[in-house]
């Protein structure tokens, strides 16, 4: 059993253990993808995040 989710009418995630939502759509896995040290595309992901300013070091600091 894996935790799954689907989006409701308001766009919020609804978590479930079922493979199909009540309206008949297939649910998505709520778990992140596995980490692999042999990741061939990490450089491309890093470059895209840097280009669009979404790296954690490029974001403004959170107020505490």
From Swiss-Prot:
InterPro entries found in the cross-reference section: H/ACA_rnp_Nop10 (IPR007264), H/ACA_rnp_Nop10_sf (IPR036756)
Cellular compartments annotated: Nucleus, Nucleolus
Keywords (A to Z) from UniProt: Nucleus, Ribonucleoprotein, Ribosome biogenesis, rRNA processing
Domain of life: Eukaryota
GO biological process terms, semicolon-separated: rRNA pseudouridine synthesis; snRNA pseudouridine synthesis
Any GO MF annotation of the entry: telomerase RNA binding
Pfam family, one: Nop10p
Protein's UniProt keywords contain Manganese: no
Gene Ontology CC annotation, any one: nucleolus
Coiled-coil blocks: none
Stated role: Non-catalytic component of the H/ACA small nucleolar ribonucleoprotein (H/ACA snoRNP), which catalyzes pseudouridylation of rRNA and is required for ribosome biogenesis. This involves the isomerization of uridine such that the ribose is subsequently attached to C5, instead of the normal N1. Pseudouridine ('psi') residues may serve to stabilize the conformation of rRNAs. The H/ACA snoRNP complex also mediates pseudouridylation of other types of RNAs. The H/ACA snoRNP complex mediates pseudouridylation at position 93 in U2 snRNA.
Cross-referenced PANTHER family: H_ACA RIBONUCLEOPROTEIN COMPLEX SUBUNIT 3, RIBOSOME BIOGENESIS PROTEIN NOP10
Family: Belongs to the NOP10 family.
Quaternary structure annotation from Swiss-Prot or TrEMBL: Component of the small nucleolar ribonucleoprotein particles containing H/ACA-type snoRNAs (H/ACA snoRNPs).
Protein name: H/ACA ribonucleoprotein complex subunit nop10
Gene field: nop10
């Amino acid at each position: 059993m894996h935790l799954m989710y689907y989006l409701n009418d308001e766009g919020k995630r609804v978590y479930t253990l079922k493979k199909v939502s009540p309206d008949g759509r297939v649910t998505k896995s709520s778990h992140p993808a596995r980490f692999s040290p042999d990741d061939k595309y990490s450089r491309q992901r890093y470059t895209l995040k840097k280009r669009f300013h979404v790296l954690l070091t490029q974001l403004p600091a959170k107020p505490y």
